C-alpha cells in the first residue's frame, strides 16, 4: 500500500513537473514569438522608412535632373541669342574678289612682251613727248612763282589803312547807337587812342609838397590879404 502510494506520489509529482515545464516552455515560446513579432514589426517599420527615404531621394534626384535638363535646354538658346550676329557673306562678292585678283595677276603678265619680239620704235617718241610736256609745265610754274613773290613784295599794305578799318568797324557795331545805354568810345572825343598811348606821361610843373607847407602857404596868403585890407 505504501509502495503504491509512493509510486502514485512520484507519478503525480512528475506530472506536475511536466505540466510546469510545458507551461514554462509555452511561456518562453510565447515570449520568443512576441519578441520575434516585435523585431519583425521594427524591421518592417525600418524597411518602410528606408523605402520612403529612398523614394524621396529618388524623387528629389529626378526633380533635380529634370530641372537641370530644362536649364540645359534653355541655355543653348540664350547662348545663341547672346552671340553677335555675323552677316552672311554673299557668294557673289567672293567670286567678284577672286575674278578681280585673277585680272590683276593677268594684267602685268600681258604687259610684258613675249619672248622673241622686239619693242616697237614708236614708244620712244611718245616717251620723249611725255618728258617734254612734263618739263614745260614745271618750267612755267617756276617762272610764275618769282613773279608772284615780286608782286607781293611790291604792294605792302599801309598801317594807317588798317587802323582806319579797325576804327570803322568799331563805329559800325550795334552797341554804339545813340539811344543805347552803352558808354561812348573814347576815340570820338580824344581822337585815336592808339597814338596817345605812345606819348610820355604829363610831368607836373610844381614839385610835390607836404601838407604842412601847403598850410603855411595858405596862412601866409590870408595874412597878406588882411594886411592889404587894413
Swiss-Prot record:
UniProt biased composition (Low complexity): 11-30
Cell location: Nucleus
Positions where Phosphoserine occurs in the chain: 180
Disulfide bonds, paired cysteine numbers: none
Keywords, alphabetical: Nucleus, Phosphoprotein
Biased composition (Basic and acidic residues): 49-78
Region (Disordered): 1-85, 97-166
CC annotations in GO: nucleoplasm
Compositional bias (Polar residues): 31-48
Principal location: nucleus
Family: Belongs to the UPF0688 family.
Protein name: UPF0688 protein C1orf174 homolog
Organism of this sequence: Mus musculus (Mouse)
